[in-house]
Design a protein with these regions (language model features):
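C-terminal cap of thioredoxin/glutaredoxin-like
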Residues: 2-6, 26, 30-32, 60, ...
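A short beta-strand-turn-helix
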Residues: 36-53
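Envelope-exposed proteins and targeting segments
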Residues: 51-54, 85, 104, 185-187
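Structural alpha/beta surface segment adjacent to cysteine/selenocysteine redox centers
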Residues: 68-150
Length: 252
């Protein structure tokens, strides 16, 4: 069954786009309607395509545990395995509350193209607390998204166009519809098809090494010696929508 965004989410996303334009000193075009964007609508691969091990992470840019994984565990995996050609990595969106903001932040990343996508992901996670704190303020998180987009070459109108892009919304819907059933929280990490529940660095190394050298040693357990890292539940499906957040007011 194809996952669909509830209508209130689409309305909230449209409201975000209007608020983005309101951030422009000149007012901008009608919610970025005339802006030219070329979003990437495919997996963005970090690393060499020929790498023998593939890590897929289902993540959300509003998920605190995803942010912790990206900042604490992932840099060492990148240095040891991705930068050395042994592993390639792909992030797939699985929005968590507030889902509209998660989708909007992902849209900004996708609009910067393959070469800058992960730079924006890192920028969002670097400014995670600022973005999330702003989301509950009167102006909302829109100014933070505009700042992030601007640092990576997007105009205010382009950010607005990205946020309202139906093509991006449809692509994220497709990602959700095609995810494995066990991917119902974030981060969900999959290594060469194996769901790894303990996402701490030492365990990830064991799993990766077992994939790189099959038969060299018994396959490691993916159960944690202690409590497994926490995850964030994915956003509620369309059949059980949560109350939408108040849209940030437009600046007169």
């Amino acid at each position: 069954m194809t996952a669909r965004f509830p209508s209130f989410r689409l309305a909230a996303i449209a409201g975000l786009a209007l608020a983005v334009v309101a951030c422009s000193k000149g007012g901008g075009s009608e919610a970025g309607a005339n802006a030219v964007i070329n979003p990437v609508l495919a997996d963005v691969v970090m690393g060499q395509d020929s790498a023998p091990v593939t890590i897929v992470e289902y993540a959300s840019l509003t998920c605190p545990h995803c942010r912790d994984f990206w900042k604490q565990e992932f840099p060492r995996i990148k240095a040891a395995y991705i930068d050395t050609g042994k592993v390639k990595y792909m992030l797939r969106e699985l929005p968590t509350p507030p889902a509209e903001l998660a989708i909007a932040a992902s849209a900004v990343a996708r609009c910067t193209g393959k070469d800058h996508y992960y730079d924006v992901v890192d920028d969002v996670y670097t400014n995670y607390h600022k973005m999330m704190d702003s989301a509950s303020s009167a102006s909302g998180a829109v100014p933070v998204l505009v700042e992030i987009g601007g640092r990576h070459g997007l105009s205010v109108d382009q950010v607005a166009a990205c946020v309202r892009s139906k093509a991006i919304q449809d692509y994220v819907s497709k990602e959700i519809a095609e995810k494995p059933d066990f991917a119902n929280s974030t981060p969900t990490v999959i290594i060469n098809g194996e769901h790894v529940t303990d996402t701490r660095y030492d365990n990830l190394v064991k799993v990766i090494e077992a994939k790189l050298n099959p038969g060299a040693a018994p396959a490691p357990t993916t159960e944690a010696a202690g409590p497994a890292p926490e995850t964030t539940p994915a956003a509620a499906p369309a059949s059980t929508p949560a109350a939408p957040p108040a849209a940030p007011p437009a600046t007169p």
